[in-house]
Amino acid sequence: SIQVIVVTDGERGLIYPPLSNIR
């Protein structure tokens, strides 16, 4: 199974998966 970790940015309040565009 593929587990996707959702990262939340408290400053912008955006939810994005761990892609190559991680800040």
Curated annotation (Swiss-Prot):
Organism domain of life: Eukaryota
Catalytic reaction equation(s): (S)-malate + NADP(+) = pyruvate + CO2 + NADPH; oxaloacetate + H(+) = pyruvate + CO2
Residues passing through the membrane, by range: none
Keyword Oxidoreductase: yes
Keyword Isomerase: no
Keywords in alphabetical order: NADP, Oxidoreductase
EC number(s) given by UniProt: 1.1.1.40
GO molecular function, one term: oxaloacetate decarboxylase activity
The protein's assembly and partners: Homotetramer.
Family: Belongs to the malic enzymes family.
This protein's name: NADP-dependent malic enzyme
Protein's organism: Populus euphratica (Euphrates poplar)
